[in-house]
């Protein structure tokens, strides 16, 4: 998989700089990966460049096969058409941040583990959207129930760590990643606020945010145990009943 992304992300960045790409993100989904490209136009060399890259990966046996498909966004899961655009922008930023993190991690240039990075990012995201710790706790409870887990107040003694708690304690490379999350989290929260003010948000933030968390964890490749360790700790950390 590493070789695939080593080839894909330079193409993504090149298309973005040439203003041919609106969005890119990926999902881990059987039988492999789903790569989602949103181009400004299907004409021109952008499609050929993407296909050439992927066909080269097949020839070099980096991947077994590929096929194009129609993308049908889960619009209503994420709050409606306008909200979906904001979520896609966040997915793009999250995908790029994940790859930067992977490059640091493989080079042994990280000072924190992936789960700590993730919980700080999600705590920051939830807090930017919501009014107070009780609402953040409620979202973590919803994340737990989406995994079939029970809402509990017991858990490991850990603080509700946010990005600002880590950013001055990590390596310069990690700081770049955390700053990118501060930016994209803030951008999505502001966009949702504007959509809500226009009456165009079909479902509330606390219904949408758990699904954003699940997609983020999918990109990071977290196991069920990884996920449970995060949401269990955060239910305890944010609980108003502790």
What are these regions (language model features)?
Residues 1-242:
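An acidic, charge-biased composition feature
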């Amino acid at each position: 998989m590493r070789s695939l992304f080593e080839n894909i992300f330079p193409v993504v960045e090149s298309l973005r700089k040439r203003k041919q790409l609106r969005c890119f993100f990926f999902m881990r989904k059987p039988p492999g990966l789903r790569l989602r490209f949103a181009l400004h136009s299907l004409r021109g060399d952008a499609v050929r460049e993407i296909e050439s890259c992927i066909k080269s990966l097949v020839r070099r046996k980096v991947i077994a096969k590929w096929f194009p498909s129609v993308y049908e966004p889960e619009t209503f899961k994420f709050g409606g058409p306008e909200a979906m655009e904001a979520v896609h922008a966040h997915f793009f930023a999250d995908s790029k941040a994940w790859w930067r993190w992977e490059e640091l991690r493989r080079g042994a240039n990280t000072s924190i583990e992936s789960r700590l990075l993730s919980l700080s990012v999600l705590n920051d995201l939830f807090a930017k959207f919501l009014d107070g710790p009780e609402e953040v706790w409620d979202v973590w409870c919803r994340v737990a129930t989406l995994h079939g887990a029970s809402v509990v107040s017991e858990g490991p003694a850990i603080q509700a760590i946010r990005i600002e708690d880590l950013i001055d304690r990590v390596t310069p490379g990690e700081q770049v990643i955390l700053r990118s999350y501060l930016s994209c989290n803030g951008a999505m929260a502001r966009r949702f606020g504007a959509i809500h003010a226009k009456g165009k948000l079909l479902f509330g933030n606390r219904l949408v945010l758990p699904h954003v968390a699940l997609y983020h964890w999918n990109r990071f490749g977290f196991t069920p145990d990884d996920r449970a360790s995060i949401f269990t700790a955060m239910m305890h950390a944010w609980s108003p009943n502790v």
